[in-house]
Amino acid sequence: MAFETLHCMQKQNANTHSYMALKLDMSKAYDHVEWSFLEELMRKMGFNERWINLMMMCLKSVTYSVLVNGEPCGMIHPTRGIRQSDPLSPFLFLLCTEGLNGLIKQAELNGDIHGVSLCRKGLKLTHLLFADDSLLFCRSNLEECDKVLEILNIYEGALGQKVNRSKTVLFFSKSTTTDARAQIKEALGVPEIMHYEKYLGLPSFVGRGKKVSFNYIKERVWRKLQSWEGKLHSQASREVLIKSVIQANLTYTMGCFKIPLGLCHEIEVLIKKFWWGQRGDRRKIHWLKWDEMTKSKMVGGMGFRDLALFNDSLLAKQAFRLLHNQDSLFYKVFKARYFHNSSIMEAAASRMGSYAWKSILKGRDVLLCGAHWKKKLKFGNIIGCQVNILHK
């Protein structure tokens, strides 16, 4: 979602409104959470009064002691904050972000800020929130910049949580003037980014150099293998490390983007060298081809993943989500932009489409290889049903 919105901003025409994206990093200040704010927030969200009282009892029953010469002394009763070791704390902390969500929605309803329009007369996005990472979208002018600052100041004052400005960055659409950029950067006190900044561990922009954008995956695999290289590992332990650590860590990125085949091959080369015990420049004989090792153990292989095929299967899962989860924001955004008059199965590739969309189409092609699909047929007032039967 974030990638698609930033791509839309990057490709906007000069004659449209200019927009900016503010990537916020909220500090995890568990000890700054105001109890009164959390209590009132739960009440506004419609929680039962008995439930609210139970939650507040859990928060207010905490006491602390200070060790003096190894002996606990005193009994401190806190008036704010939530315990980091409490299993409830992460969920209560996430509830607090609903306050920011409400402030942004109210500002949008009042016309104080305007979200990014992803297509003509279509859906507009003002913010995306995930854990302590947030993306805010608005027009790149001082009026809306001041409103965003006001919202953040209200939120910080009520909750006690602070914006980590050292990790907060700005991105502007092409149509934003140089003067407007300078004024907004000065007002917010955060730097501007251009390319290859990450959001939730993934690159926010992917240009023509796909390998450059995703080369961090190979570097991460290489560092992990280097840390294991000096240790003595049996073949069984190497198998476990490859399957449960190296190949499992690739799942997140491969589930969103199509990784270049050359990069997949280079990562597989690193895995092969580790499997056969090669260290540094010392060469080892590879007794079995990689294609054979990716086969199931039932047919003589090792059950390692073919990374290119694994990538395609994960992208097919995203296409399947677009096919069936039609109430999600994920579906609404992509349908409005790419297949508003059809379904994902009939959608055509767009020259101006984002790399995320092109990657999903690769997964869609996998579904088409193993599915029978028929469009809706209309006979008078009778509309036939869609048929999509997986036969493989």
Give the location of each predicted region.
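A helix-boundary/hinge signal
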Residues: 1-392
